[in-house]
Design a protein with these regions (language model features):
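Metalloprotease/metallohydrolase-associated module, dominated by Zn2+-dependent proteases
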Residues: 1-50, 66-112
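Active-site recognition of the HExxH zinc-binding catalytic motif
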Residues: 53-65
Length: 112
């Protein structure tokens, strides 16, 4: 497991914790992101492949927090408008995450 990940201009610490030691890792929660602390927490006793998916999930949360603008489509806008909103939200930040974190890419490519 990696110990940090750069997301845009922010560096997030990545830690593993046991469910019984962390009340935020409630039933059904495998990880969480605290934006104000630049912290990503992953449940420690998961399989490697589940940790990989969970870390990527939390990176997406952090990316949204870092890059989301206040301009959102209206609820009544067409699907294509919303689709482009989400693609635009992630296109640059995900490219930066992959470029800035070669150790993350290597770790994500490892198999169980």
């Amino acid at each position: 497991m990696i110990s940090k990940v750069k997301i845009g201009a922010q560096v997030f610490r990545v830690v593993e914790r046991l469910r019984e030691d962390d009340g935020m890792l409630s039933e059904g929660s495998l990880g969480y992101t605290l934006d104000d602390e630049n912290l990503i927490v992953i449940q420690k006793n998961l399989s490697k492949s589940k940790k990989q998916v969970t870390l990527w999930h939390e990176i997406l949360h952090a990316a949204r927090m870092a890059w989301e603008s206040n301009v959102r489509p209206k609820k009544t806008d067409e699907y294509e408008v919303w689709e482009h909103y989400f693609i635009g939200l992630y296109e640059s930040v995900l490219l930066l995450v992959l470029r800035d974190n070669p150790e993350l890419v290597d770790w994500l490519r490892e198999e169980d």
